[in-house]
């Protein structure tokens, strides 16, 4: 299982890349491996308001459909339209292919997320 230093992680297997008051959010390598071959990603609407813990996307694979939960609260600024036509990009590199970009409405929520090392330890216990 791969992690990327500098990103933050949730126990629901989402990653967050913070840039100022904005954040990119995607699913982790652990999540895409567990799902298997991804065939569809349901994207939210730009300007949607999401709260920490809310489902913001459904990721469907040949095995299952799984909600992706937002690790932070914010307003959706952008969605990764490439995933509409090529959901398999999440299998190819889950960390290079974000799902949404949000404007953070409560940056203090970031303090409750895991570092790459903490997340790797969490996943080892889950496996």
From Swiss-Prot:
Which InterPro entries does this entry report, sorted A to Z? Biotin_lipoyl (IPR000089), GCV_H (IPR002930), GCV_H/Fam206 (IPR033753), GCV_H_sub (IPR017453), Single_hybrid_motif (IPR011053)
N6-lipoyllysine is carried by which residues? 63
Query: What cofactor does this one take?
Result: (R)-lipoate
* Gene Ontology CC: cytoplasm; glycine cleavage complex
Q: How is the cofactor bound?
A: Binds 1 lipoyl cofactor covalently.
Domain Lipoyl-binding per the UniProt entry, residue ranges: 22-103
Is Metal-binding given among the entry's keywords?
Answer: no
What processes does the entry annotate via GO biological process terms?
A: glycine decarboxylation via glycine cleavage system
Q: Which Pfam families match?
A: GCV_H (PF01597)
Q: Which UniProt keywords apply?
A: Lipoyl
Extract the PANTHER family matched here.
Answer: GLYCINE CLEAVAGE SYSTEM H PROTEIN, GLYCINE CLEAVAGE SYSTEM H PROTEIN-RELATED
Function recorded in the entry: The glycine cleavage system catalyzes the degradation of glycine. The H protein shuttles the methylamine group of glycine from the P protein to the T protein.
> Could you say which protein family the record assigns here?
Belongs to the GcvH family.
* Record text on subunit structure and interactions: The glycine cleavage system is composed of four proteins: P, T, L and H.
Query: What is this protein's name?
Result: Glycine cleavage system H protein
The lineage is: Bacteria, Bacillati, Bacillota, Clostridia, Peptostreptococcales
Q: Which gene encodes it?
A: gcvH
């Amino acid at each position: 299982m791969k992690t990327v230093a500098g990103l933050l992680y949730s126990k629901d297997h989402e990653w967050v890349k913070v840039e100022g008051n904005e954040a990119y959010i995607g699913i982790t390598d652990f999540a895409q491996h567990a799902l298997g071959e991804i065939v569809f990603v349901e994207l939210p609407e730009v300007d949607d308001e999401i709260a920490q813990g809310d489902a913001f996307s459904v990721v469907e694979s040949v095995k299952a459909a799984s909600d992706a939960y937002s690790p932070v609260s914010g307003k959706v600024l952008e969605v990764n339209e490439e995933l509409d036509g090529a959901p398999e990009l999440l299998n190819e590199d889950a960390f290079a292919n974000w799902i949404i970009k949000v404007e953070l409405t409560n940056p203090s929520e970031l303090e409750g997320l895991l570092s790459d090392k903490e997340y790797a330890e969490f996943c080892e216990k889950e496996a």
